[in-house]
Structure formats: C-alpha cells, structure tokens
Amino acid sequence: MAIIKINEVNKTTRLTNVNETMPIIALIGPTTYGPVGVPTEIYSEDEFNNIFGATYSETYPYAAIAAKKYLSQQGVVLFTRLGIGATAASYSIGDLITITANHEGTYGNNFSISIKSAIVNGTTTYKITTMINNETEIFADLKNFTLSELKEKGSIEMKYVTLTAGTALTVDSILDGVDNKSLEGGLNGDIFFNSEETKQTDLNNLITTLQGILQQLEDPQIYEFAIIAMPGICGVKNLSANGSGIVNGNTVVDQFVTLTESRKDCVALIDPFIESSYQEILTDLLMEEVNSCYLSVYYPWYNAAVPELNSNILMPPSVFYLDACATSFHINKPWNAVAGPLTGKCSNCINTVIKVGSKMSQALNNMFINPIVYNRNFGYYIDGNNVLNSAANTRTYSQLGIRQGINYAKRELTKLCHIMSYKQNSSLVRSEVLGRVSKLLEGLKAGEAIYGYRAYINESVMDMADGIIRLTVKIYPTPALEEFVFDFEIVNSESALNE
C-alpha cells in the first residue's frame, strides 16, 4: 500500500497555470427529480435533465443552473441532490392499485398518469402512460399490464413510476379509466428555513443531511473532483450562527473545511449571506475562526438572466465563479484560477446587489475574499484570486491558482504511488517511479503550472531489502526557490503484498 505524508511550504509571488483537461466539479443542491443524496457523475445537459429533471427547483435552483452551464462547455459534474424530508407523490385507485413516483420531489407532484383498458386475445389489458405538467408528450414511460401479472409480482416498476397492488386487488377486479390524473402528496424537500419557529430544527436537519452526503465524498479514490460547492445554501442568514445549538457543533462551513482538508485535493466555494455588507462577511460566516487553504469565498450576490426561467433572479457569487470557470477552462488553461477582466467573467450578470469599487475590492482582497467588481470597459468580473488563509505569512500562499495546480499534482502523484505499490520488482519499480513522476511534472512545467521540480528516492540498503521506496518530490511553483514538498512511502515487497 502507499502511505503518504505531505509537508507544504510556499512563499512565492507568481500565479500558476496548467494546460490540462477540464477538472471535475462537485455540486450539491435541490433539483426537481432524481435520487436524493446519491453522488452521480453527469456528462451532458441531456443526461442531467434525464436524471435530475429539466425544470429548476422553486427556491434553490442555483446548483442546477451552475451544473448545466458547466456541462454545456463539455465539463463533468458530480451532482448530489439535496432534499430534506422529501417524499414521493402518489395516486391510488381505491384499495386496488397505487401509482407512486420513483423519486421524491416536485417532479412527482407534476406527474400525470392515464390508464386505459383494452381486450387483447380475450384478456383485459391495461395501458398506463405518464406525462409531465399534463403535456401530451410521453416520456417513453408506458406499460401494458394485466391484473394477474400485477397481483403475481406485487409491483411493476416503470421509468418514472411504480405500480403496486392494493390489498383488495384480485384478478377479477375492474379498474376505472384514468385520464391525466396528477399524482399528489409529494414534498420536494428544498424549502429550507420556511419560518422562524422551525429554523433551528430545519438547520439541524440540513446539517445532518449534509453530513451524510459529505461522508460519501470523503474518499478521493471513489469520487474525484477539484471544486465543490453548495451554491446559495451557505448564504442563508444565521446558517452559521448559534454554533452551540447545531448538531455536533458543526456548521456548513465547518463541514466543508473538514472534507477539503481531509481530502487535500479540492477547494470548496463559500457564499456570504445575501444581506451582508462587506464589513460583516467575516463575522457572518465565522471566518475569524476559519483559516484554510481549501476554501474560497466570493462576494456579493448578483442578478442574472436565466433564459430557462424567462426571468432575472438573484444568484450567489459561487455560481458567478463557476460560470466563469465553464467558459475560461474550456478556452484557456483550466487550472488557472479564474480572475481578472479577461477570464473571470460571467455570461449573464446584470448587476450586483452591492457595487464594489476599487477601495472595497482592495479591502475584500485583504480579507482573502474575492469580489465581483464592475469596470466600464470590461463589465463584471472577479477581482480576486484567494483561498481563505488569513493566517498565511505571505499573500501568495493563499493564491487559488497555486492551490489548484498543487492539488492536481498531489492527486496525480498519489494515484501513481498507489499503482506502483502493487509492482513486485523493487529495483525495476524505483526507476519506473522516477520516470513516471518526471513525465507528469514535465507536462505541468510545459503547461506553466509549475516552474520546476526535483524528485529523488532514498537509496537506503535497508529500504531496498525491505522493498520500500521513499520518494520525495519538491515542486517549485515559481522562479523563487520556496517549495511544496511531498514525501511518499511506497511499500511494494512481495511479503507486504501477501500479508
């Protein structure tokens, strides 16, 4: 197995880029359909619409909007539907049959069904079709069945609904025809903090639900992504307040810190509260207690045109950043942190709720927060390139461009070491390790992700006898000699493999 120890030092002053394929991003948020709490890799807008619904949730559409924008630029999204207390809609015909939506949520409420009977070869056969919003289009979801078949099987699962036999159903029962009957009783689970009376309970439920989702995302070998966000939901007033009353004392920000610092290969995007002035951001988000190289905060919220909704809506700044990423990553170099008037631009920004000028922008950057600013020549763009690391000794230690490039190198080196740990010829593996490391880092150097590197293996006689490779990789992001140091211990002896 590969045992990895990492020590990082960086005091450099130059931004970094890397010319690689678009990174995978992880998004968490409500949708109108699909499995709740199941991380799902999505590769196209059509696939997203098929799995999570083509329409947006009424209260928190931000994650779905960001996902579709990123997918439209040939990116890959690891999407997890968030639904607290979501239930599936259904419809019953007496005690004979129940039709239930396969997934919880608004989509279930909008399902309509039609049931018609016909005599086929002397047997009464029923045909059920499903539609959405009472439209005539049938979503390839129709089924012919007999009552004896349903009685024998107990249930019949279709693409969008499941038929279940009722207690009174017999093979001689007669089902009344149904025409465009809507399913009822579904709850989409995305209306958080609906009243002051239930806010604390709703918050605890959100924290508990999020814990379950983030636990699934802890292992980078199972789910790979470079950026994770839960757009807009971190921006609800009092979400991080009253920490002592929250489940296990954890806030949303705390959980993202725990996840990203455990994985050490991704950055979490955090939104401020909608009403926050720039002086209040640190207090509102409890940022005075959070110093992490794996969080990036953006400000302020903005109004955006959303063609699918045929309206303008208020959007969290993390979506602005992801929108800029979708375009910039596809055209330029994806590991360059999106900032500046040429790359940090959003395609549909109308205005920001607070107009950020040069002085406010400088103040926000001094707090390691990335502002959305306006310039008459360039329009709205991100004027910051920071992770939230206010404890850093130097400004550049917190540059998001360096963080992303190093995260990528770290992830690829880790994969390489795991592969090498299963090679059984120790001397052969030593040369192969250095060869593969050089090939990886030469590519990053050519793509301007790093300025230089050095890789070497401890040639201890004892290590060689035990089949252990101690690999040290030093990466220099800039012409300065300060470095990121990666220490890997690879155990690849036959005895270790057979233990």
Show the residue positions of the predicted features:
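Structured, hydrophobic secondary-structure cores that serve as assembly/anchoring elements
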Residues: 1-92, 97-100, 215-499
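Small/polar, repeat-rich beta-turn/loop motifs that tile beta-strand-dominated architectures
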Residues: 2-4, 9, 13, 25-29, ...
